C-alpha cells in the first residue's frame, strides 16, 4: 500500500498513463499489484511505449535493464517516487 499521498497520486497518474498507452486497457482493470505482462497483457512493444511515456511525463530516464525489472504497477510507482524525489543528477 502506498505510504504517502504523493505515492498514491503517482500510482493514480501511472494507472491513467497505462490506460492511455496500452490499447484495450481501462483504468478499472489496473490494480496496484497487477503484473504488466501476466495480468494486463503488456507486450514488449507496449512496454517500450509505456517507458517512453513515463520518461516524457516525469522527465526522467529509465534504463532498459531497470525497466525490465519493474514488473508490477506498484514497483513502477515506487521507482517513480524515488526518481522524482531524487535531486537532479542523483541516482534513482
UniProtKB/Swiss-Prot annotation:
O-(pantetheine 4'-phosphoryl)serine carried by residues: 44
Gene: acpP
Protein name, as recorded: Acyl carrier protein
One Gene Ontology term, aspect cellular component: membrane
Keyword set includes Phosphoprotein: yes
Pathway(s) the chain acts in: Lipid metabolism; fatty acid biosynthesis
Functional description taken from the UniProt entry: Carrier of the growing fatty acid chain in fatty acid biosynthesis.
Stored InterPro entries: ACP, ACP-like_sf, PP-bd_ACP
Modification note: 4'-phosphopantetheine is transferred from CoA to a specific serine of apo-ACP by AcpS. This modification is essential for activity because fatty acids are bound in thioester linkage to the sulfhydryl of the prosthetic group.
Keyword flag NAD: no
Localization per record: Cytoplasm
GO biological process, one term: lipid A biosynthetic process
HAMAP family linked to this entry: Acyl_carrier
Family: Belongs to the acyl carrier protein (ACP) family.
GO terms assigned for molecular function: acyl binding; acyl carrier activity
Signal peptide (UniProt feature, chain positions): none
Keywords: Cytoplasm, Fatty acid biosynthesis, Fatty acid metabolism, Lipid biosynthesis, Lipid metabolism, Phosphopantetheine, Phosphoprotein
Carrier domain segment(s): 1-84
Amino acid at each position: 500500500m502506498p505510504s504517502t499521498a504523493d505515492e498514491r497520486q503517482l500510482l493514480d497518474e501511472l494507472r491513467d498513463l497505462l490506460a492511455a498507452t496500452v490499447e484495450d486497457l481501462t483504468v478499472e482493470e489496473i490494480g496496484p499489484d497487477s503484473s504488466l505482462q501476466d495480468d494486463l497483457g503488456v507486450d514488449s512493444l507496449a512496454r517500450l511505449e509505456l517507458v517512453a511515456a513515463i520518461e516524457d511525463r516525469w522527465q526522467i530516464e529509465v534504463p532498459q535493464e531497470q525497466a525490465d525489472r519493474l514488473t508490477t504497477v506498484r514497483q513502477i510507482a515506487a521507482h517513480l517516487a524515488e526518481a522524482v524525489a531524487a535531486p537532479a543528477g542523483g541516482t534513482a
